[in-house]
Design a protein with these regions (language model features):
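Extracellular/periplasmic solute-recognition and catalytic clefts
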Residues: 105-116, 132-195, 216
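Short, solvent-exposed loop/beta-turn-alpha elements that line the ligand-binding surface or hinge
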Residues: 27-36, 75-107, 120-127, 165-181, ...
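Append "and occasionally in soluble cytosolic enzymes with long acidic Gly/Pro-rich linkers
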Residues: 197-287, 297, 378
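Short, well-ordered beta-strand elements
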Residues: 18-21, 58-59, 100-103, 113-114, ...
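Surface-exposed binding/hinge segments that line
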Residues: 12, 38-84
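Aromatic- and charge-enriched surface segment that lines or borders ligand/interaction sites
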Residues: 1-31, 195
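Bilobed periplasmic-binding protein-like "clamshell/Venus-flytrap" ligand-binding domains
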Residues: 67-73, 255-273, 318-322, 366-401
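Periplasmic binding protein-like
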Residues: 10, 290-340, 375
Length: 424
Protein backbone atom coordinates (compact mmCIF):
# COMPACT_ATOMS: atom_id res chain seq x y z
CA UNK A 1 0.00 0.00 0.00
CA UNK A 2 0.96 3.62 -0.44
CA UNK A 3 3.10 4.96 2.41
CA UNK A 4 2.12 7.88 4.66
CA UNK A 5 -1.62 7.81 4.03
CA UNK A 6 -3.80 8.97 6.91
CA UNK A 7 -7.49 8.67 7.61
CA UNK A 8 -9.47 11.80 8.33
CA UNK A 9 -9.32 11.04 12.07
CA UNK A 10 -5.50 10.87 12.00
CA UNK A 11 -5.18 7.08 12.05
CA UNK A 12 -2.64 5.52 9.66
CA UNK A 13 -3.68 3.42 6.71
CA UNK A 14 -1.94 0.06 7.08
CA UNK A 15 -2.60 -3.65 6.70
CA UNK A 16 -4.36 -3.84 10.05
CA UNK A 17 -6.82 -1.16 8.94
CA UNK A 18 -7.58 -3.03 5.71
CA UNK A 19 -8.11 -6.33 7.54
CA UNK A 20 -10.40 -4.57 10.04
CA UNK A 21 -12.52 -3.37 7.10
CA UNK A 22 -12.73 -6.82 5.52
CA UNK A 23 -13.72 -8.29 8.88
CA UNK A 24 -16.42 -5.66 9.07
CA UNK A 25 -17.62 -6.56 5.52
CA UNK A 26 -17.98 -10.18 6.63
CA UNK A 27 -19.75 -9.18 9.83
CA UNK A 28 -22.44 -6.98 8.28
CA UNK A 29 -22.98 -8.65 4.88
CA UNK A 30 -25.47 -8.46 3.36
CA UNK A 31 -26.16 -4.89 4.50
CA UNK A 32 -28.76 -3.06 2.44
CA UNK A 33 -28.92 0.67 1.84
CA UNK A 34 -30.70 3.10 -0.50
CA UNK A 35 -27.53 3.04 -2.60
CA UNK A 36 -25.82 -0.34 -3.03
CA UNK A 37 -26.06 -3.46 -0.90
CA UNK A 38 -22.81 -4.31 0.87
CA UNK A 39 -22.32 -8.03 0.30
CA UNK A 40 -18.83 -9.50 0.41
CA UNK A 41 -19.98 -12.75 -1.18
CA UNK A 42 -21.00 -11.00 -4.39
CA UNK A 43 -18.22 -8.41 -4.36
CA UNK A 44 -15.43 -10.89 -3.54
CA UNK A 45 -16.81 -14.30 -4.52
CA UNK A 46 -14.80 -17.16 -3.11
CA UNK A 47 -12.79 -15.04 -0.67
CA UNK A 48 -11.36 -17.35 2.00
CA UNK A 49 -9.04 -15.12 4.03
CA UNK A 50 -7.28 -11.76 4.32
CA UNK A 51 -3.73 -12.20 5.60
CA UNK A 52 -1.28 -9.59 6.88
CA UNK A 53 2.19 -9.85 5.32
CA UNK A 54 3.72 -6.79 6.98
CA UNK A 55 2.56 -3.35 8.10
CA UNK A 56 1.99 -2.15 4.52
CA UNK A 57 1.19 -5.41 2.72
CA UNK A 58 -1.68 -7.89 2.83
CA UNK A 59 -2.84 -10.89 0.84
CA UNK A 60 -6.30 -11.92 -0.30
CA UNK A 61 -6.79 -15.70 -0.48
CA UNK A 62 -9.48 -17.05 -2.82
CA UNK A 63 -10.92 -20.45 -3.68
CA UNK A 64 -10.12 -19.74 -7.35
CA UNK A 65 -7.70 -17.37 -9.12
CA UNK A 66 -9.02 -13.83 -9.62
CA UNK A 67 -7.47 -12.26 -12.74
CA UNK A 68 -9.83 -9.28 -12.56
CA UNK A 69 -9.36 -8.63 -8.84
CA UNK A 70 -8.26 -5.03 -9.41
CA UNK A 71 -11.67 -4.29 -10.94
CA UNK A 72 -13.36 -5.60 -7.79
CA UNK A 73 -11.12 -3.55 -5.52
CA UNK A 74 -12.45 -0.27 -6.92
CA UNK A 75 -16.13 -1.16 -6.59
CA UNK A 76 -18.72 0.25 -4.19
CA UNK A 77 -18.12 -2.57 -1.72
CA UNK A 78 -14.46 -1.73 -1.19
CA UNK A 79 -14.16 1.56 0.72
CA UNK A 80 -11.56 1.55 3.48
CA UNK A 81 -12.48 3.46 6.63
CA UNK A 82 -10.59 4.16 9.82
CA UNK A 83 -10.59 0.99 11.98
CA UNK A 84 -11.86 3.17 14.86
CA UNK A 85 -14.95 4.09 12.77
CA UNK A 86 -17.08 1.04 13.64
CA UNK A 87 -18.97 -0.11 16.70
CA UNK A 88 -19.26 -3.72 17.85
CA UNK A 89 -22.06 -4.34 15.34
CA UNK A 90 -20.03 -3.02 12.41
CA UNK A 91 -22.07 0.18 12.08
CA UNK A 92 -20.51 3.65 11.92
CA UNK A 93 -19.96 5.19 15.34
CA UNK A 94 -19.91 8.67 13.84
CA UNK A 95 -19.34 10.28 10.47
CA UNK A 96 -17.37 8.10 7.99
CA UNK A 97 -13.60 8.61 8.20
CA UNK A 98 -11.93 7.85 4.87
CA UNK A 99 -8.69 8.96 3.21
CA UNK A 100 -9.97 11.15 0.35
CA UNK A 101 -9.33 14.81 -0.49
CA UNK A 102 -12.50 15.86 1.37
CA UNK A 103 -13.56 15.11 4.92
CA UNK A 104 -17.25 14.87 5.79
CA UNK A 105 -17.65 17.30 8.69
CA UNK A 106 -21.43 17.60 8.90
CA UNK A 107 -24.39 15.65 7.60
CA UNK A 108 -28.10 16.28 7.91
CA UNK A 109 -30.08 13.43 6.36
CA UNK A 110 -32.10 14.47 3.30
CA UNK A 111 -30.83 18.05 3.69
CA UNK A 112 -27.11 18.48 3.09
CA UNK A 113 -23.56 17.20 3.55
CA UNK A 114 -20.71 19.58 4.36
CA UNK A 115 -17.31 18.67 2.92
CA UNK A 116 -14.04 20.21 4.05
CA UNK A 117 -10.67 19.90 2.31
CA UNK A 118 -8.48 17.40 4.17
CA UNK A 119 -5.10 18.96 4.87
CA UNK A 120 -3.56 15.53 5.45
CA UNK A 121 -4.50 14.21 2.02
CA UNK A 122 -1.59 12.37 0.38
CA UNK A 123 -2.30 13.62 -3.16
CA UNK A 124 -3.07 16.97 -4.72
CA UNK A 125 -5.15 18.95 -2.26
CA UNK A 126 -8.74 19.95 -3.04
CA UNK A 127 -9.02 23.39 -4.65
CA UNK A 128 -12.01 24.47 -2.53
CA UNK A 129 -11.84 24.77 1.26
CA UNK A 130 -15.49 23.84 1.84
CA UNK A 131 -18.32 22.55 -0.33
CA UNK A 132 -21.90 22.11 0.82
CA UNK A 133 -23.82 19.45 -1.10
CA UNK A 134 -27.54 20.04 -0.75
CA UNK A 135 -30.34 17.56 -1.29
CA UNK A 136 -32.98 18.98 -3.66
CA UNK A 137 -35.10 16.07 -4.95
CA UNK A 138 -37.30 17.98 -7.41
CA UNK A 139 -35.58 18.75 -10.75
CA UNK A 140 -37.52 21.97 -11.31
CA UNK A 141 -36.53 23.22 -7.85
CA UNK A 142 -32.89 22.34 -8.59
CA UNK A 143 -33.06 24.32 -11.83
CA UNK A 144 -34.63 27.31 -10.08
CA UNK A 145 -31.94 27.22 -7.38
CA UNK A 146 -29.22 27.11 -10.03
CA UNK A 147 -30.69 29.98 -12.07
CA UNK A 148 -31.12 32.16 -8.97
CA UNK A 149 -27.52 31.63 -7.82
CA UNK A 150 -28.63 29.79 -4.69
CA UNK A 151 -26.45 26.87 -5.81
CA UNK A 152 -23.49 26.83 -8.22
CA UNK A 153 -23.93 23.41 -9.77
CA UNK A 154 -25.87 20.15 -9.78
CA UNK A 155 -24.46 16.64 -9.47
CA UNK A 156 -25.36 12.95 -9.10
CA UNK A 157 -27.65 10.68 -11.13
CA UNK A 158 -30.21 12.53 -13.22
CA UNK A 159 -28.80 15.81 -11.89
CA UNK A 160 -30.53 17.76 -14.62
CA UNK A 161 -33.00 16.28 -17.11
CA UNK A 162 -31.91 16.90 -20.72
CA UNK A 163 -34.95 19.08 -21.48
CA UNK A 164 -34.08 21.37 -18.57
CA UNK A 165 -30.44 21.39 -19.64
CA UNK A 166 -31.51 22.64 -23.05
CA UNK A 167 -33.48 25.44 -21.40
CA UNK A 168 -30.58 26.34 -19.13
CA UNK A 169 -28.13 26.69 -22.02
CA UNK A 170 -30.19 29.59 -23.38
CA UNK A 171 -28.54 31.61 -20.60
CA UNK A 172 -24.84 32.29 -21.33
CA UNK A 173 -23.84 32.23 -17.67
CA UNK A 174 -24.36 28.45 -17.46
CA UNK A 175 -22.55 25.45 -18.91
CA UNK A 176 -23.20 21.72 -19.34
CA UNK A 177 -20.74 18.83 -19.04
CA UNK A 178 -21.58 15.32 -20.26
CA UNK A 179 -19.77 11.99 -20.60
CA UNK A 180 -20.51 8.27 -20.50
CA UNK A 181 -22.20 6.90 -17.40
CA UNK A 182 -22.01 3.54 -15.62
CA UNK A 183 -25.83 3.60 -15.36
CA UNK A 184 -28.00 1.57 -17.73
CA UNK A 185 -31.78 1.77 -18.13
CA UNK A 186 -33.96 -1.31 -18.51
CA UNK A 187 -37.52 -2.48 -18.81
CA UNK A 188 -37.78 -5.41 -16.38
CA UNK A 189 -40.34 -8.06 -17.38
CA UNK A 190 -41.98 -10.32 -14.84
CA UNK A 191 -40.79 -13.60 -16.28
CA UNK A 192 -42.68 -15.69 -13.76
CA UNK A 193 -46.10 -15.23 -15.33
CA UNK A 194 -47.77 -14.73 -18.70
CA UNK A 195 -47.23 -13.14 -21.06
CA UNK A 196 -43.57 -12.34 -20.28
CA UNK A 197 -42.63 -15.86 -19.23
CA UNK A 198 -42.55 -16.37 -23.00
CA UNK A 199 -39.28 -15.06 -24.54
CA UNK A 200 -41.14 -14.29 -27.77
CA UNK A 201 -43.25 -11.72 -25.93
CA UNK A 202 -40.13 -10.13 -24.43
CA UNK A 203 -38.62 -9.98 -27.92
CA UNK A 204 -41.82 -8.44 -29.27
CA UNK A 205 -41.66 -5.63 -26.70
CA UNK A 206 -37.96 -5.09 -27.40
CA UNK A 207 -38.47 -4.84 -31.16
CA UNK A 208 -41.49 -2.57 -30.73
CA UNK A 209 -39.52 0.12 -28.89
CA UNK A 210 -37.71 2.63 -31.07
CA UNK A 211 -34.81 3.27 -28.71
CA UNK A 212 -33.21 5.84 -30.97
CA UNK A 213 -36.39 7.90 -30.92
CA UNK A 214 -36.69 7.45 -27.15
CA UNK A 215 -33.15 8.72 -26.58
CA UNK A 216 -33.58 11.60 -29.03
CA UNK A 217 -37.03 12.79 -27.96
CA UNK A 218 -36.87 12.38 -24.18
CA UNK A 219 -33.12 12.56 -23.48
CA UNK A 220 -31.98 14.88 -26.31
CA UNK A 221 -29.52 12.33 -27.64
CA UNK A 222 -27.18 12.26 -24.63
CA UNK A 223 -27.53 8.51 -23.81
CA UNK A 224 -26.67 5.65 -26.17
CA UNK A 225 -29.43 3.31 -27.33
CA UNK A 226 -28.55 -0.37 -26.93
CA UNK A 227 -29.94 -3.88 -26.67
CA UNK A 228 -26.90 -5.03 -24.67
CA UNK A 229 -27.43 -5.88 -21.02
CA UNK A 230 -23.87 -4.76 -20.20
CA UNK A 231 -23.00 -1.08 -19.77
CA UNK A 232 -20.66 0.45 -22.36
CA UNK A 233 -18.12 1.63 -19.75
CA UNK A 234 -17.07 -1.97 -19.11
CA UNK A 235 -13.88 -3.06 -20.93
CA UNK A 236 -15.76 -6.24 -21.85
CA UNK A 237 -18.62 -4.39 -23.55
CA UNK A 238 -19.75 -5.71 -26.94
CA UNK A 239 -21.41 -3.19 -29.25
CA UNK A 240 -24.92 -4.36 -30.12
CA UNK A 241 -27.26 -2.16 -32.11
CA UNK A 242 -30.98 -1.95 -31.25
CA UNK A 243 -33.32 -4.03 -33.40
CA UNK A 244 -36.42 -1.94 -34.20
CA UNK A 245 -38.85 -4.08 -36.22
CA UNK A 246 -42.44 -3.24 -35.27
CA UNK A 247 -44.10 -5.48 -37.88
CA UNK A 248 -42.10 -8.51 -36.75
CA UNK A 249 -42.92 -7.58 -33.15
CA UNK A 250 -46.65 -7.63 -33.91
CA UNK A 251 -46.35 -11.12 -35.45
CA UNK A 252 -44.59 -12.44 -32.35
CA UNK A 253 -47.28 -10.92 -30.13
CA UNK A 254 -49.99 -12.71 -32.14
CA UNK A 255 -48.10 -16.00 -31.75
CA UNK A 256 -48.17 -15.56 -27.98
CA UNK A 257 -51.57 -13.94 -27.41
CA UNK A 258 -53.56 -15.12 -30.39
CA UNK A 259 -56.45 -12.70 -30.95
CA UNK A 260 -56.76 -11.76 -27.28
CA UNK A 261 -55.76 -8.46 -25.72
CA UNK A 262 -53.89 -8.50 -22.43
CA UNK A 263 -54.08 -5.92 -19.62
CA UNK A 264 -50.69 -5.41 -17.93
CA UNK A 265 -49.21 -3.23 -15.18
CA UNK A 266 -46.15 -1.05 -15.80
CA UNK A 267 -44.70 0.10 -12.47
CA UNK A 268 -42.61 3.25 -12.17
CA UNK A 269 -40.51 4.20 -9.09
CA UNK A 270 -41.05 7.69 -7.68
CA UNK A 271 -37.28 8.18 -7.30
CA UNK A 272 -37.00 7.78 -11.07
CA UNK A 273 -39.47 10.61 -11.60
CA UNK A 274 -37.12 12.94 -9.69
CA UNK A 275 -34.21 12.07 -11.96
CA UNK A 276 -35.54 11.12 -15.36
CA UNK A 277 -38.53 11.81 -17.68
CA UNK A 278 -40.03 8.50 -16.56
CA UNK A 279 -43.63 9.67 -16.73
CA UNK A 280 -43.28 10.58 -20.41
CA UNK A 281 -41.30 7.37 -20.99
CA UNK A 282 -44.01 5.24 -19.38
CA UNK A 283 -46.69 6.97 -21.46
CA UNK A 284 -44.66 6.37 -24.62
CA UNK A 285 -44.48 2.65 -23.84
CA UNK A 286 -48.19 2.66 -23.03
CA UNK A 287 -48.86 4.04 -26.51
CA UNK A 288 -46.57 1.81 -28.59
CA UNK A 289 -47.43 -1.43 -26.77
CA UNK A 290 -51.07 -1.06 -27.75
CA UNK A 291 -50.03 -2.43 -31.13
CA UNK A 292 -48.85 -5.60 -29.39
CA UNK A 293 -52.36 -6.17 -27.95
CA UNK A 294 -51.11 -4.95 -24.57
CA UNK A 295 -53.22 -2.48 -22.59
CA UNK A 296 -50.78 -0.85 -20.20
CA UNK A 297 -51.83 0.44 -16.79
CA UNK A 298 -49.17 2.75 -15.30
CA UNK A 299 -48.65 2.47 -11.54
CA UNK A 300 -46.34 4.94 -9.80
CA UNK A 301 -44.93 3.50 -6.56
CA UNK A 302 -42.59 4.80 -3.87
CA UNK A 303 -39.26 3.04 -3.43
CA UNK A 304 -40.37 0.49 -0.82
CA UNK A 305 -43.61 -0.37 -2.62
CA UNK A 306 -41.76 -0.65 -5.93
CA UNK A 307 -39.28 -3.17 -4.49
CA UNK A 308 -42.07 -5.12 -2.82
CA UNK A 309 -44.10 -5.31 -6.03
CA UNK A 310 -41.08 -6.68 -7.88
CA UNK A 311 -40.20 -9.24 -5.21
CA UNK A 312 -43.80 -10.48 -4.99
CA UNK A 313 -44.25 -10.47 -8.76
CA UNK A 314 -47.07 -7.96 -8.50
CA UNK A 315 -46.27 -6.32 -11.84
CA UNK A 316 -45.74 -7.08 -15.51
CA UNK A 317 -43.16 -4.49 -16.61
CA UNK A 318 -41.01 -2.12 -14.56
CA UNK A 319 -38.82 0.87 -15.42
CA UNK A 320 -35.46 0.35 -13.75
CA UNK A 321 -31.82 1.39 -13.69
CA UNK A 322 -28.68 -0.51 -12.79
CA UNK A 323 -25.16 0.73 -12.18
CA UNK A 324 -22.07 -1.19 -13.21
CA UNK A 325 -20.44 -2.24 -9.90
CA UNK A 326 -16.98 -2.51 -11.48
CA UNK A 327 -15.21 -3.17 -14.76
CA UNK A 328 -15.53 -6.95 -14.48
CA UNK A 329 -19.21 -7.80 -15.13
CA UNK A 330 -19.11 -11.18 -13.34
CA UNK A 331 -21.17 -9.96 -10.38
CA UNK A 332 -23.68 -8.21 -12.63
CA UNK A 333 -24.11 -11.24 -14.88
CA UNK A 334 -24.44 -13.53 -11.87
CA UNK A 335 -27.05 -11.35 -10.16
CA UNK A 336 -29.29 -11.09 -13.22
CA UNK A 337 -28.56 -14.12 -15.43
CA UNK A 338 -27.78 -16.91 -12.99
CA UNK A 339 -30.78 -19.09 -12.16
CA UNK A 340 -30.05 -18.37 -8.48
CA UNK A 341 -29.04 -14.73 -8.99
CA UNK A 342 -30.16 -12.22 -6.35
CA UNK A 343 -31.59 -9.71 -8.83
CA UNK A 344 -33.16 -12.49 -10.88
CA UNK A 345 -35.07 -13.56 -7.78
CA UNK A 346 -35.83 -10.21 -6.16
CA UNK A 347 -37.14 -8.73 -9.44
CA UNK A 348 -39.17 -11.85 -10.34
CA UNK A 349 -37.37 -12.16 -13.67
CA UNK A 350 -37.85 -15.92 -13.61
CA UNK A 351 -34.84 -16.50 -15.86
CA UNK A 352 -33.08 -19.83 -16.24
CA UNK A 353 -30.65 -20.94 -18.93
CA UNK A 354 -28.40 -23.94 -18.33
CA UNK A 355 -25.79 -22.65 -20.76
CA UNK A 356 -25.59 -19.35 -18.87
CA UNK A 357 -25.14 -21.17 -15.54
CA UNK A 358 -22.41 -23.26 -17.15
CA UNK A 359 -20.59 -20.19 -18.49
CA UNK A 360 -20.79 -18.39 -15.14
CA UNK A 361 -19.25 -21.42 -13.42
CA UNK A 362 -16.59 -21.64 -16.11
CA UNK A 363 -15.55 -17.97 -15.90
CA UNK A 364 -14.84 -18.30 -12.16
CA UNK A 365 -11.74 -20.38 -12.95
CA UNK A 366 -10.76 -18.73 -16.25
CA UNK A 367 -7.35 -17.02 -15.96
CA UNK A 368 -6.91 -15.93 -19.57
CA UNK A 369 -8.38 -12.49 -20.19
CA UNK A 370 -9.00 -13.43 -23.83
CA UNK A 371 -10.98 -16.52 -22.80
CA UNK A 372 -12.81 -14.46 -20.20
CA UNK A 373 -13.75 -11.96 -22.88
CA UNK A 374 -15.07 -14.77 -25.11
CA UNK A 375 -17.28 -16.01 -22.28
CA UNK A 376 -18.60 -12.52 -21.59
CA UNK A 377 -19.26 -12.01 -25.30
CA UNK A 378 -21.37 -15.17 -25.37
CA UNK A 379 -23.26 -14.09 -22.25
CA UNK A 380 -24.03 -10.72 -23.83
CA UNK A 381 -25.29 -12.44 -26.99
CA UNK A 382 -27.50 -14.83 -25.02
CA UNK A 383 -28.92 -11.99 -22.91
CA UNK A 384 -29.79 -10.01 -26.04
CA UNK A 385 -31.66 -13.03 -27.38
CA UNK A 386 -33.40 -14.29 -24.22
CA UNK A 387 -33.96 -10.82 -22.71
CA UNK A 388 -34.23 -11.70 -19.02
CA UNK A 389 -34.47 -7.93 -18.80
CA UNK A 390 -34.95 -5.58 -21.75
CA UNK A 391 -32.08 -3.07 -22.12
CA UNK A 392 -33.04 0.39 -23.34
CA UNK A 393 -29.99 2.66 -23.27
CA UNK A 394 -26.71 3.47 -21.56
CA UNK A 395 -27.19 6.71 -19.70
CA UNK A 396 -24.99 9.80 -19.93
CA UNK A 397 -23.55 11.55 -16.90
CA UNK A 398 -24.97 15.05 -17.34
CA UNK A 399 -24.29 17.97 -14.99
CA UNK A 400 -24.81 21.73 -15.13
CA UNK A 401 -23.01 24.60 -13.42
CA UNK A 402 -22.66 28.36 -13.18
CA UNK A 403 -19.60 29.74 -14.98
CA UNK A 404 -18.65 31.49 -11.73
CA UNK A 405 -16.99 28.16 -10.88
CA UNK A 406 -14.43 26.21 -12.87
CA UNK A 407 -12.87 22.74 -12.76
CA UNK A 408 -16.30 21.14 -12.57
CA UNK A 409 -16.78 18.34 -15.10
CA UNK A 410 -18.81 15.16 -15.38
CA UNK A 411 -17.10 11.80 -14.87
CA UNK A 412 -18.54 8.35 -15.55
CA UNK A 413 -19.82 8.31 -11.98
CA UNK A 414 -19.73 11.71 -10.31
CA UNK A 415 -17.84 14.94 -10.87
CA UNK A 416 -14.35 16.41 -10.59
CA UNK A 417 -15.27 17.82 -7.18
CA UNK A 418 -11.68 18.21 -5.87
CA UNK A 419 -10.87 20.50 -8.83
CA UNK A 420 -13.84 22.81 -8.28
CA UNK A 421 -12.97 26.43 -7.46
CA UNK A 422 -14.16 29.98 -8.05
CA UNK A 423 -13.41 31.15 -11.58
CA UNK A 424 -12.36 34.67 -10.59
Amino acid sequence: MRENVKFHDGEKLNADAVIANFNRYKQVSPKSSPFYTLDIKSSYPGLKDVVKIDDMSFKLVFENPQPTLLYSMVNFSSPIYSPKNFNEKGDFNGLPQGTGPFKLVEHQKDQYALLEAFDGYYGEKAAAKRIRVRVIPDPDTRLAALKSGEIMGVMDLGAIPPTLAKELLKDSQFEISATKSTISHYLHPNGKKAPFDNPNMRQAVSMMIDRQQLVKELYLGYPTATVNFLNNTSPFYKDMKPDYRPEEAKKLAVEVLGSQRKSIDLIVPTYGLDRYPYKAQAELFQSVLKDLQLDVNIRILDGAAFKEAQSKGDYDLALATQGLPNGDPYTLFTNYLSSTGSSNKSYSLGYKNDRVDQLLNQVKTTLSMDERKNIYNELQTIAASDLPTIPLFNDASLIAYNKKITGYKATIYGTTLPELKWAS
